[in-house]
A protein has these predicted regions:
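N-terminal beta1-alpha1 cap of cysteine-dependent amidohydrolase-like domains
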Residues: 1-85
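Structural motif
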Residues: 7, 85-89, 120-121, 155-156
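Short glycine-rich anion-binding loops that position phosphate/pyrophosphate groups of nucleotides
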Residues: 11, 91-94, 125
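Short, hinge-like loop/turn segments at secondary-structure boundaries
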Residues: 55-56, 137-139, 198
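Flexible gly/pro-rich beta->alpha loop and the following alpha-helix that scaffold active-site loops
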Residues: 63-117
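Solvent-exposed alpha-helices and their adjacent loops that cap or buttress functional pockets
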Residues: 79-80, 111, 147-149, 173-174, ...
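Class I SAM-dependent methyltransferase SAM-binding "motif I" and its flanking Rossmann-like core
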Residues: 97-99, 106-166
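Conserved anion/nucleotide-ligand pocket segment
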Residues: 155-201
């Protein structure tokens, strides 16, 4: 059984419907019926408009989403294991990881990944899979945050932004974290069994 992570720097259904990268994710799933895809909007603090766009983007799938009050549900692991795709939205990486760890949801995601669920995510939802990431704070500065460690190294989305690029380059030079992936908003990385399979430009 292959393990798959698709790390999206920007774009996707939050900007375009239909979006090529979202079709690409669905095509990764081998399913006889409707693809079961679950959206995890923790990083946006469950912004309703974001959730609505998710359902609009995947009308032919068996779509669902997970709210913060359900993260620690005793039924959550079984639910996640039933999904073909777990799609993590963008937003505040630090807030998202804190909520996940408080609920033990990070461990549930790792287990679902080992069971064959495709992990996909955009921006914060892409950074989180790596060992460590550099995250923007509310005051515009940046801080190092420990990721889930499913993929080695670090990942920087939105690398076309001058302030982010400068902060990341300085941090990466001092921290010497490898591998180090820097992506602009039209780029995506596809990993299979923790190895980089492809870089997509959309």
């Amino acid at each position: 059984m292959n393990r798959t992570i698709i790390a999206i720097a920007g774009g996707g259904f939050s900007q375009h419907i239909p979006a090529y990268i979202d079709e690409y994710i669905i095509n990764e799933v081998r399913s006889d019926g409707a693809v079961r895809i679950c959206f995890i909007p923790t990083a946006s603090n469950e912004a309703q408009g974001y959730i609505d766009r998710f359902y609009e983007a995947f009308p032919h799938c068996d779509a669902s989403h997970v709210t913060q009050d359900k993260l620690a549900s005793p039924l959550m692991q079984a639910f996640l294991n039933e999904q073909d795709v777990l799609y993590v939205g963008g937003g505040n990486t630090q807030f998202m990881l804190k909520k996940w760890r408080e609920a033990g949801f990070d461990a549930l995601l790792k287990n679902a990944y080992q069971q064959g669920a495709v992990l996909a995510g955009i921006s914060a939802g892409a950074m989180c899979w790596f060992d460590v990431c550099l995250c923007e704070k509310e005051d515009g500065s940046y801080e190092e945050v420990q990721g889930l460690g499913l993929l080695a190294g670090t990942f920087c989305p939105h690398y076309q932004e001058p302030a982010r690029k400068e902060a990341f380059d300085k941090w990466q030079t001092e921290a010497i974290i490898q591998p180090s992936y820097t992506l602009t908003d039209d780029e995506t990385l596809h990993f299979r069994n923790e190895e980089l399979l492809a870089k997509l430009i959309t």
